[in-house]
Regions:
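N-terminal subdomain of nucleotide-sugar transferases
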Residues: 1-63, 174, 254-256
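A short, well-ordered alpha-helix in the C-terminal region of glycosyltransferases
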Residues: 368, 375, 382-397, 406-409
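Nucleotide-activated donor-binding/catalytic signature segment of Leloir-type glycosyltransferases, i.e.
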Residues: 267, 275-303
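Membrane-proximal helix-turn-helix segments that form the acceptor-binding/catalytic region
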Residues: 119-122, 126-130, 143, 155-175
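Nucleotide-sugar-dependent
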Residues: 242, 298-305, 310-331, 341-350
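Conserved acidic donor-binding segment of nucleotide-sugar-dependent glycosyltransferases
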Residues: 354-366, 375-380
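Carbohydrate-associated surface elements
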Residues: 181, 200-201
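Conserved donor-binding/catalytic core segment of Leloir-type glycosyltransferases
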Residues: 12, 202, 221-242, 248-251, ...
Length: 416
């Protein structure tokens, strides 16, 4: 990877994700890397553990270029189910050695770390700090505000996040955060001009239609119900923080007005709230016949589901998690040009207006969410008009090339 002509540095993005398939974190780093490259700056993904699409047997594709993005996996030391072990720590150390070697060989690198658990990733942080390699932690949520850790592993991880919260503002070159709330939070720990707000990113290419094989079960389900029912889509963890209990109650209210509706859900419930528990609640509410769980689906399948949805939901609860973060899926939803109901949390109202580009409901309020659902289906042509406005506004304020350019300028300023 040679140094770009437009700037005199390369950007190494470090994140422990399933690449190129994966969930929100994979989408984050992929679109950022693409945006950086589109701005004529070299970028590379460095990924500790796992392997291409999680296939640990195929070591021949652990380094290469995927959709213009150079990537390199560090998985010499095998691990189990992507969990923290001594071997995964050794993989992290290998990345630290790689960064140090590049610096010794004359590469002028800037490091962005998406994985900010200090216990697990401190070799990378300390290598950058001791060798004066600029590095920018990238935070998309206030991790220490997460719900109380239950397992030993999650308690250890929470300790790592707390250490990062204390140490990284003191030793990093700057911070990249997803919301103004997070900027305000970290401004108590470091100068404001060293904090860049980089919100969700969108790519207009994501609005292009996705096709699945005819024998794909997801496609068969969607095709058999499209135009017969209102397909209302929720994707997430099914937890309180994502407002799922309120969505269920709101959906039940909607069925009195628009009975030919199906709540289509995807995602991975937590082990503390398994799908069996969710289905039990759905059954008790009397909406089981209008509920469909499709499981944890692939990214192209998720895009297909979203593009064929009649309504998409992002109804987070009013919590520290929601207010300091920004739902990445909102950007993906906006690219579908389909109506969206979100709740009034965090920075959403800063960018999108209710009844103009999106439908906004009160958080933790099933009645408010239900009223918005009814509004959408009572005048669906108007709802589609609002959704198209949302698409255009997203391209204006979240475009990945423009926002990546702003981030590059922020980095350049903080290298002076």
């Amino acid at each position: 990877m040679e140094t770009s002509q437009s700037v005199n540095f390369n950007i190494l993005i470090i994140s422990d994700v399933d690449f190129p398939e994966g969930m929100a974190a994979t989408a984050h780093i992929t679109i950022l890397a693409k945006g950086i490259i589109k701005n004529s700056v070299n970028a590379m993904l460095l990924i500790p553990s796992s392997s291409f699409n999680g296939d640990t047997e195929k070591y021949d594709i652990n380094e290469g270029i995927h959709e213009e993005i150079p990537y390199k996996f560090f998985n010499k030391h095998g691990i189990v189910n992507n969990k923290f072990t001594f071997n995964s720590y050794r993989n992290v150390k290998d990345i630290a050695k790689y960064i140090k070697k590049r610096e010794k060989n004359g590469f002028n690198d800037v490091v962005i770390t998406y994985c900010n658990d200090f216990l697990k990733y401190h070799p990378i942080f300390l290598t950058c700090y001791s060798h004066k390699i600029p590095f920018f932690p990238w935070e998309v949520e206030k991790r220490i505000s997460s719900s109380e850790a239950k397992s030993f592993r999650s308690k250890l991880q929470m300790l790592g996040f707390r250490l990062s919260d204390i140490i990284l503002p003191k030793i990093s070159t700057g911070f990249i955060v997803i919301s103004t709330y997070l900027k305000q939070y970290y401004s108590n720990k470091m100068p404001q001009d060293k904090i860049c707000v980089s919100p969700i990113l969108v790519n207009s290419d994501d609005s292009l239609s996705v096709q699945l094989q005819e024998n794909n079960k997801i496609k068969q389900f969607i095709d058999s119900n499209k135009n017969k029912f209102n397909l209302i889509v929720y994707s997430g963890s099914f937890g309180e923080k994502d407002g799922f209990p309120y969505i269920l109650d709101a959906f039940k209210k909607l069925l009195f007005h628009h009975p030919k509706s199906i709540l289509v859900t995807t995602g991975k419930p937590s082990k503390y709230n398994p799908i069996e528990n969710i289905l039990k609640i759905v059954n008790e509410l009397g909406i089981i016949d209008n509920f469909k769980y499709l499981g944890l689906v692939k990214r192209d399948e998720l895009k297909f589901i979203n593009q064929n949805a009649d309504l998409l939901l992002v109804c987070r609860s009013n919590s520290e998690f929601a207010n300091h973060g920004f739902p990445w899926k909102l950007g993906e939803y906006l690219m579908t040009k389909n109506p969206i109901i979100a709740t009034k949390v965090g920075d959403i109202e800063t960018y999108l207006q209710d009844n103009k580009e999106i439908f906004l409901a009160e958080p933790e309020n099933a009645e408010s969410i239900a009223n918005k659902m009814i509004q959408v289906f009572d005048d669906y042509d108007k709802a589609k008009e609002i959704a198209n406005n949302g698409y255009l506004k997203a391209l204006e304020v979240f475009d990945y090339v423009k926002k990546s350019k702003e981030l590059i300028e922020f980095i350049k300023i903080n290298l002076k």
